Amino acid sequence: MSDGKDSLDLSGLGAAVPNAKELSAEDKANLVESIKNTLQGLAARHTDVLESLEPKVRKRVEVLREIQSQHDDLEAKFFEERAALEAKYQKMYEPLYSKRYEIVNGVVEVDGVTKEAADETPAEQKEEKGVPEFWLNAMKNHEILSEEIQERDEEALKYLKDIKWYRISEPKGFKLEFYFDTNPFFKNSVLTKTYHMIDEDEPILEKAIGTEIEWFPGKCLTQKVLKKKPKKGSKNTKPITKTENCESFFNFFSPPQVPDDDEEIDEDTAEQLQNQMEQDYDIGSTIRDKIIPHAVSWFTGEAAQDEDFEGIMDDEDDDDEDDDDDEDEDDEDDDEDDEDEKKGGRVPSGEGQQGERPAECKQQ
């Protein structure tokens, strides 16, 4: 019965109340009263809808609402149990992730590798530890992430040692952590990206927060310096330098900023911001759900092949559905032709048969 306008939008509540503990008693009372009034207004509108129905129909709808309430209770229990199950298995994954970290970064050696390496590695070649460029190649093999990684980013991402994620509760959401070895690009050893969700069970993003990267002088990958020669005859003979923002994977740590509630933005700007936030969330959730749990499969390219195969199968299913639709249309056309013959003869040959229905078939 709802057209979507009756839903309670609390997306601005986090921005409006950054820290509820700092609110005075009066402010808290006003906030509670405001929410209560909003809910009462929604309830009144729903009551109006019910009262506009015929008594018998209204009774049926009331029973449907009771059924929906039972469903919502079960759904809440499902979300609760699912969260507990995810937390349980997340702890079971941790030892496996730790072993992966140690192998990738050369902390431990795999049985049998030492002797094989001594036999196969040329004496003049330096033996590499672990799996070089593991995370860089794992991410590059994913279609979404490969579009974000620029060629100039790759040297810095070779220092990426590990990626972890954690679920957070206050506020709800999740946090990504990128661990880097000492490198010539930035000072940070860990870069983080935190997603605050309005509802953890629904992917409704409130805002995202990234680490401020401490770039070393002249090493910032999110900006480029343009040098322009001065005009002829100019007294200033030095090149003119201009700094511009540029595409980089590391822009991921400077997410789109959601404006304050009292800041007005036009429709086009709002749509652009929404698209940017959706894209940003896609990148974060891809790293969380695909790259971290299946990193070696993305490193080898197996996971990418699996996704390509699934995409082909989906396309074939769509083609089959289209073929079925075409066959149904052909059958309908044949039936119409048969009906026309019964009424007064065959459809005239010529223009009417080239994918078009004849204008009219009159009886003689």
UniProtKB/Swiss-Prot annotation:
InterPro entries for this protein: NAP-like_sf, NAP_family
Sequence motif Nuclear export signal, location on chain: 53-68
Region described as Disordered: 250-269, 301-364
Gene3D superfamilies: 1.20.5.1500, Nucleosome assembly protein
Pfam families according to UniProt: NAP
Prosegment location in residue numbers: 362-364
GO cellular component: cytoplasm; nucleus
Modified residues (Cysteine methyl ester): C361
Motif Nuclear localization signal boundaries: 227-232
Compartments reported by the entry: Nucleus; Cytoplasm
GO molecular function: histone binding
Tissue specificity as recorded in UniProt: Highly expressed in tissues exhibiting active cell-division activities, such as root and shoot meristems and young flowers.
Lipid attachment site numbers (S-farnesyl cysteine): C361
Keywords: Chaperone, Coiled coil, Cytoplasm, Lipoprotein, Methylation, Nucleus, Prenylation
Coiled coil residues, start to end: 32-86
GO BP of this protein: double-strand break repair via homologous recombination; nucleosome assembly
Domain writeup: The acidic domain is probably involved in the interaction with histones.
Family the entry assigns: Belongs to the nucleosome assembly protein (NAP) family.
Subunit structure: Binds preferentially histone H1 in vitro.
Function: May modulate chromatin structure by regulation of nucleosome assembly/disassembly.
UniProt-recorded name of the protein: Nucleosome assembly protein 1;2
Source species taxonomy: Eukaryota, Viridiplantae, Streptophyta, Embryophyta, Tracheophyta
Gene responsible for this protein: NAP1;2
